[in-house]
């Protein structure tokens, strides 16, 4: 399948690496623009951009996908599905409706618990004993879509960083499994999220 991958941090990079080992074709990557980081105040590329460049994959850098420029750029890649992992911005309705098979999000929690930007960190801070990963069909609501291929991961004594790496690797494999089924026409069991147990994972303040 022709895929446009959207993501920014290391979590997304690990998912992208799993995807690149599959039979599917990543035709472009969308990531947030280079940002000034660290004590040296240097302009640094996102981990996803660096990964894409290693594999000579075209990179689009947008902090938002609301512009006509971004929309037209995505049309030109003729992708069948968009795969999103911690991109860092909401997708407008017309972007969600652009690819034939819609948009899939790799979300680092057992939805509907910890919807939002920082599900892994919030699970650790809350003292949760387990969390997980799921492949969600994206819609306009914040992490409200149907979910497939859920996997549970024990938190134990893991740091948020170690847990994030583990969830990304598991999530990448789940994503490939769902894409394989979409490509072959195999039925996928999508589960609607419960209206109970909803919590929100607000982004953590820096510092």
Predicted regions and their residues:
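Residue-level detector of anion-binding/catalytic polar loops
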Residues: 25, 58, 130
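N-terminal glycine-/serine-/threonine-rich beta1-alpha1-beta2 phosphate-ribose binding loop
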Residues: 32, 36-80
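Alpha-helical oligomerization interface recognition
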Residues: 63-134, 138, 144
């Amino acid at each position: 399948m022709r895929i446009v991958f959207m993501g920014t941090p290391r979590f997304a990079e690990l998912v992208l690496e799993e995807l690149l080992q599959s039979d599917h074709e990543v035709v472009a990557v969308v990531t947030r623009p280079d940002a000034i980081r660290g004590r040296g105040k240097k302009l640094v590329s996102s981990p996803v951009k660096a990964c894409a460049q290693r594999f000579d994959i075209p990179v689009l850098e947008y902090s938002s996908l609301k512009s006509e420029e971004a929309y037209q750029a995505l049309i030109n890649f003729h992708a069948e599905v968009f795969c999103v992992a911690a991109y860092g911005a909401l997708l407008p309705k017309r972007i969600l409706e652009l690819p034939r098979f819609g948009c899939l999000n790799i979300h680092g929690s057992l939805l509907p618990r910890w919807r939002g930007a920082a599900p892994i960190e919030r699970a650790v801070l809350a003292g949760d004993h387990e969390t997980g990963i799921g492949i969600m069909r994206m819609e306009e609501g914040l992490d409200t879509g149907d979910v497939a291929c859920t996997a549970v991961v024990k938190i134990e004594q893991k740091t948020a960083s170690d847990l994030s790496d583990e969830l990304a690797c598991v999530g990448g494999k789940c994503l490939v499994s769902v894409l394989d089924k979409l490509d072959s026409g195999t039925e996928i069991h999508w589960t609607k999220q419960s209206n109970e147990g909803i919590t929100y994972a607000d982004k953590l303040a820096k510092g």
